[in-house]
Amino acid sequence: MQTSKENQTEREVIDIKSLMIDTLRKMGCDPKEIEGGAVAVAYQGENFCMKFGGMFVNIWDLGWCDINVNDLNLPRLRQAINLANFEFGPTIVLADPDENGIMDIHSRYGILFHPSLPNLTEYMAITFNWFFRAKNNLHINYNRLLVEDEKQQTNQNPNDTNPCNN
């Protein structure tokens, strides 16, 4: 038998999920309920998955990039992910490798979502845009680390030149 507190939490989840679906529709999105009570939605060409818990929503941008465990760039990518995760916003997650040695890259962001928040459509647009910013920060950090590594290699062996630069 459920207690009144459990019933209240269940109602909050349903109400918050309904509010989120309505908000996403107002933004021109077409949200879909999927298994496990989650909601899938596309925004500006990116696919997001939302899971609800009380007044909180965990938003995932799943599998937007991948890398093989044997890729020589993996250490640099890990370092770039760590640097990007110091920024405010979504956390970038490097998943465990699958049976083929492929590691997916995801982003996750936990937000408060409640009817008392002003302008929920703008709030969600800003929230989604943080995902794009996190990806951009990852690319910026990766490219900066790549340049630093190339400078370090050039300084170690000045006679070793890149044949593509001739």
Residue ranges: model-predicted function:
Residues 1-53:
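Charge-rich, low-complexity N-terminal segments
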Residues 38-39, 57, 103-105:
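Hydrophobic residues embedded in beta-strands of well-ordered beta-sheets
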Residues 49-67:
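A short acidic-to-branched-hydrophobic micro-motif
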Residues 63-108:
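Short, internal acidic amphipathic alpha-helical interface segments
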Residues 113-129:
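A short acidic/glycine-rich loop-to-helix N-cap element
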Residues 130-134:
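Glycine-rich, aromatic-bearing surface loops/beta-hairpins
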Residues 141-166:
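Short, highly charged C-terminal tails/helix-capping segments
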